[in-house]
């Protein structure tokens, strides 16, 4: 190949104008949201994001060169909500799709991966692979025995019986209420998965449930049962795609016989989307006032103050998130806002602050649609509940309308390691949050405050959801729900992913599909993001960077694991759900 040919191939990736087959390799992982810093952006520049998939497939629908989509499932685990998102996008793609993989788990469960494959028109499985569509398992760890061994005594109060973080640290076994909600979570996940598989594979639900209990199932048995369409290796998958979708070409350089072969041009979805976006980037630079749906993300623990990045991730600082929502309110080009929530909650005060900004957006005449990701619980639900509509994935963990508070008593630990801590208090309750046990007065204060926060949470939730408080109360009590169950009970409005939320936002803005641009907020050059904002009302205040000495010190403290608890509106426990 000449130097000129090599340069041409770089500039024009498909010089022969072959049919394009998009490749989505889930084994390489999928990012759910855009990087929050320039450094993260550099490290993740080759990764595929949900936005790449959504925008790339949307562009491919209108591109006559694109003839199909090949999805490599692989074994990389995706969170259940992300798996819902990917499956929804694949199912909505109207051109032919093939899903292939080496195995759906190797003698282990991989139910979420198989559900994604079922969104494709056709499924291929390696001969030695298995279908591990075996259901869902949830587990939680109780630390009471371990804490006792080191002399730590947990003291937590909760509202109410389902807000079960207290037993995570103080229980020797899970409560009946916790066992009930955990069992319902996995049952709901399996019910939805069975329904999806039965519909996609044209099977009876009872038949699918029976196959779940037989998993893992070998390739030939899976083929016979109708769970897959073909048994074959990767090369056989790509040979089949070339024969179906390729253009016949006479080969010479690598095949001296000069026989005719079918050829395609594979392209990763993220690379295809980047090229498609580049072609319109210049025009968009001069059309920033184009009517748009603004997407604002609330990712991570909700904390007071800014979203200061750290090695362990970037929390959802309520000051930063509030500024982003204000920026959208003041931007005349933003016709509607999608608030993307992936948070287990945190600060009650911060959550209420964000909810206020959501309500002000609505008062300004701009519809707000909440889109729930993997988790939108407790404080994560609080910031979403004031939206015009709430959209949740069927596997989203949401609800947890409740409150908890407490501390760890460290006197026993100090005694065991020979540590002496002395102090002085100026004020009757100045030492309430020190390492000692609560006094009776302090415990009364804590419980009164938890009652007040719980009442505020449930009252506002009932108001936002338009239901009487006595109807909402049984759905609250700290209980978590899947998105599917929450929709049946009126806690969310629609079951679907971000693509569904964007469609609902366009409808509420009175726009036709595709009429509004999709803009991730804040949309600013990296250099501007590094500059300090002029005030809390300026666009730059929506970034959340703090590169001063205090900000760097807080980041260093977070690196050393010295971060404060997220807050009283936190998800009570984080179940480890394995599929």
Where are these regions (language model features)?
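Conserved hydrophobic/aromatic pocket- or pore-lining residues that grip, position, or stack substrates
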Residues: 296, 339, 384
